[in-house]
Amino acid sequence: MTNYPSIFNDVIGPVMRGPSSSHCAASLRIARICRDLMDEQIKDILIEFDPNGSLATTHKSQGSDMGLFGGFLGWEAFDERLQDSEQYLATAGINYSIKICELAEKHPNTYQITLTNDKEKRTLVAISTGGGMIEVINIDGNKVSMAGDYFETLIYCTDATSIINYLEATILFDEITFHQGVHSFIEIKSQNIIPENICNEIKQMPTVTFIKAINPVLPIMARKNLKVPFITCNEMMEYNKDKNKSLWELAVDYESIRGNISPALVMDKMKAIIQIMRNAIETGLKGTNYKDRILGSQSPQYKETFEANQLIGGDVINKTIMYVSAIMEVKSSMGVIVAAPTAGSCGGLPGVVFGTADSIHKNED
């Protein structure tokens, strides 16, 4: 199925804590899918990284471990407990081990995860594709493609024909695929979770062993026959020929159509993100503390110097520098930021936008 970028999935986000969206937020999303795959009952976890990939030497320092542990516990990427997630994992009675070994999948950001409890053992392979985005590429030896933007139902079975016939006549779905292997299952992508009464009927079928329900982890879902009003600058200008809309209005149109949500909801989501960005600026300017970073808090001193008119003139530039620094210091102290879409540059977009807007006295609307 054709997919297109979403502003909230791919650009303005994720909302998170930690040094890297492609490590912290992505690993947390992968682990939340793992949690659903195990019906939230996890006892032991084996996490494997390839020695030639990027994660073998960075999984701890860049926050992959932290994100994984939080995801296994069902947390959000902005949960205030994340920096202590390893201790919370132990308290929950979940054991883990990390192994560096050669993997079949050669993508540099590959996670191979084996999960067990008293009843079952499942294996999942996923990759972090950047900016907090992910793709699950293998479950129990079967090739799949899950981006975390659908409700996914996996029906493990020995024969699929009668089950698929029943599903096609009974439920609304976007795609049904049968993955045949040692652990065969039917994968259903849909806009909503399959109703419990239908799942109960399916469980009674003789060829069905069990069913797994996996929730979406992205803020904006995909769908069958997805359309967008434009995808290039030329298409945007053509779309706007008879509308005369400003860029922000075109962005609202795009995300509303892309996400199948109302323009009002697009605005509400963006206002919530704006508030998080503003809070990060204010928090950073008050001063932040964190033991494990090279430089301490410098934004408050910059603010004092700015307010005392001791900087070379240039209100927009000086405010932008101050705001970017404040947000980056919040990021490095494990505060909540909007990655937009990388945590390593999370101060850039809001720093410039808010620095300019505040300098020319524009409100947040």
Question: Which residue stretches match the model-derived regions?
Answer:
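Glycine/serine-rich anion-binding loops at beta->alpha junctions
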Residues: 14-27, 332-354
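Alpha-helix capping at helix-to-loop junctions
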Residues: 326-333, 358, 362
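Phosphate/pyrophosphate-binding betaalpha-module
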Residues: 349-365
